[in-house]
């Protein structure tokens, strides 16, 4: 299965690209969004793409374009680096595609897929950090349960965590399909519309890569370094990250209605004036896109414009 960029046309429209602007694609992946952004940039425009997967970075290095640079690392660290590199000149647009790529899922040795057997690794950057199988081995039942509940919103987190912990005491779980079988046996009722391992794999991956902290940090950085009337565009794939982005936009978003309870106090006026962004809208994939690319079915595109 080849990687198809999700909501490509909608993303490019949302960025509202200025020909001579400076843009950041925080998640290069297979380069689909990056290549499309380059089509809209003028000769003096700049595009910086970031990825913490060395294989993706090596793909990016094959793009020979003086307007383009590929950077290896986490977007929470590399976005501020790009800002400083450009002498603190404000950015014209930032894109974050928060999903894992089809290429990563298809690589058995990465451990992201619950449909293929491979080593339980799950690190986006597999040159550093602890692989998933080692974390599961060293963790207590309570630690595993907490992660499954917090990051996977798994209703059977207690049953699954006990099953994982007890199995690891006898024999170390190192393979993806071994973990899948343990999950299946632990769950009393299987949802016919969702694979039983979906939430557990999601939770472990989020924990191993510290994805939520990364996202929250990057949201705060982005609204500080974007130009006025320029946009932050984010593609979310699961309810947890979608909720974080939605609430962040809501917290920092401009209030366009008059609050109840007149007269308005000075404190309320300051709160309204201090809003940093205008929430544009959210976009979901059309039925035609979902039919062509099933991966897109859970995607939500959220757009915020700086004030």
Curated annotation (Swiss-Prot):
The cross-references to Gene3D superfamilies, in alphabetical order and at most eight, read: Putative methyltransferase TM0872, insert domain (1.10.150.170), Vaccinia Virus protein VP39 (3.40.50.150)
What's a GO biological-process term for it? rRNA base methylation
Question: Subcellular localization, per the record?
Answer: Cytoplasm
User: EC number(s) of the enzyme?
Assistant: 2.1.1.199
Q: Which UniProt keywords apply?
A: Cytoplasm, Methyltransferase, rRNA processing, S-adenosyl-L-methionine, Transferase
Cite the InterPro entries for this sequence. Answer: RsmH, SAM-dep_MeTrfase_MraW_recog, SAM-dependent_MTases_sf
Tell me the superkingdom of the source.
Answer: Bacteria
User: What role does this protein play?
Assistant: Specifically methylates the N4 position of cytidine in position 1402 (C1402) of 16S rRNA.
Query: Where does this protein hold S-adenosyl-L-methionine?
Result: 31-33, 51, 83, 97, 104
For this chain, the family text in UniProt reads: Belongs to the methyltransferase superfamily. RsmH family.
Q: Where is this protein primarily located?
A: cytoplasm
Q: Which GO terms describe its molecular function?
A: rRNA (cytosine-N4-)-methyltransferase activity
Quote the protein name from its UniProt record: Ribosomal RNA small subunit methyltransferase H
Catalysed reaction equations from the record: cytidine(1402) in 16S rRNA + S-adenosyl-L-methionine = N(4)-methylcytidine(1402) in 16S rRNA + S-adenosyl-L-homocysteine + H(+)
């Amino acid at each position: 299965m080849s990687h198809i960029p999700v909501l490509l046309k909608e993303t490019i429209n949302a960025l509202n690209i200025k020909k001579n602007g400076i843009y950041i694609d925080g998640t290069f992946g297979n380069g689909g969004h990056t290549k499309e952004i380059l089509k809209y940039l003028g000769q003096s425009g700049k595009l910086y793409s970031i990825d913490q997967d060395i294989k993706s970075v090596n793909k990016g290095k094959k793009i020979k374009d003086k307007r383009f640079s590929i950077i290896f690392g986490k977007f929470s660290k590399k976005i501020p680096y790009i800002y400083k590199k450009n002498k603190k000149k404000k950015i014209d647009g930032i894109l974050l595609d928060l999903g894992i790529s089809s290429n990563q899922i298809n690589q058995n040795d990465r451990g992201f897929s619950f449909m293929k057997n491979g080593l339980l690794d799950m690190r986006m950057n597999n040159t550093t950090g602890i692989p998933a199988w080692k974390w599961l081995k060293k963790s207590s039942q309570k630690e595993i349960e907490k992660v499954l509940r917090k990051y996977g919103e798994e209703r059977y987190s207690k049953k699954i965590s006990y099953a994982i912990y007890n199995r690891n005491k006898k024999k170390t779980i190192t393979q993806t399909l071994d973990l899948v079988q343990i999950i299946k046996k632990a769950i009393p009722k299987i949802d016919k519309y969702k694979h039983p391992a979906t939430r557990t794999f999601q939770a472990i991956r989020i924990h191993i890569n510290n994805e939520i902290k990364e996202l929250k940090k990057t949201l705060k950085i982005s609204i500080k370094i974007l130009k006025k009337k320029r946009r932050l565009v984010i593609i979310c794939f699961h309810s947890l990250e979608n909720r974080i982005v939605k609430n962040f936009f809501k917290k920092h978003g401009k209030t366009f209605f008059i609050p109840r309870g007149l007269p308005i106090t000075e404190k309320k006026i300051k709160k309204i004036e201090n809003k940093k962004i205008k929430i544009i809208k959210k976009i979901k994939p059309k039925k035609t896109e979902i039919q062509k690319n099933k991966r897109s079915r859970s995607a939500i595109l959220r757009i915020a414009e700086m004030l």
